[in-house]
């Protein structure tokens, strides 16, 4: 648990042996979200790479479409509101030999940690694939 700019959050993280810029690009590129996000099957967005103010809709595994707005996107950290509710934050921290990808989960959404762990495994695999040039 950690205090973030958005309040106390549960952190789920993973060390990834890839350049932080590459992992950050996977986080902000909406075309990649369905590849690493297990709860997202499609994204409709005002732009490919998010920034503060970006809006769109994600389609979930159950087919539900929910709107989102990116509330902050700077210094390798972005946050959003999904269906008007503050949702998981995303950040990348530089480490020796790579980076650490982190999800900041609102305390009321603690069960979502399992989904975030799965997302981090997928993100790691995708980053490794990109690093090798596959």
Where are these regions (language model features)?
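Hydrophobic ligand-binding cavity/cleft-lining segments
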Residues: 1-46
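Short secondary-structure boundary/capping segments
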Residues: 2-4, 48, 70, 91-93
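Well-ordered beta-strand positions in beta-sheet-rich domains
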Residues: 11-15, 65-67, 89, 102, ...
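Short beta-strand-to-loop capping motifs
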Residues: 14-18, 60, 105-107
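Glycine-rich portal/gate segments that line the openings of hydrophobic small-molecule binding cavities
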Residues: 34-35, 44-87, 98-100, 107
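Beta-strand/loop substructures that line and gate deep hydrophobic ligand-binding cavities in soluble
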Residues: 77-134
């Amino acid at each position: 648990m950690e205090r973030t700019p958005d309040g106390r959050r549960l952190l789920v993280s993973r060390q990834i042996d890839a350049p932080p810029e590459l992992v950050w690009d996977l986080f902000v590129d909406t075309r990649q979200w369905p590849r690493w996000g297990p709860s997202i099957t499609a994204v409709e967005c005002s732009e490919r790479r998010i920034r503060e103010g970006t809006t769109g809709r994600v389609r979930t595994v159950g087919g539900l479409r929910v709107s989102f707005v990116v509330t902050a996107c700077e210094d390798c950290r972005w946050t959003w509101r999904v269906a008007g509710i503050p949702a998981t934050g995303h950040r990348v921290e530089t480490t020796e030999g790579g980076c650490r990808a982190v999800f900041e989960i609102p305390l009321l959404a603690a069960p979502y940690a399992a989904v975030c762990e799965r997302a981090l495994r997928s993100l790691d695999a995708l980053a490794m694939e990109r690093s090798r040039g596959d």
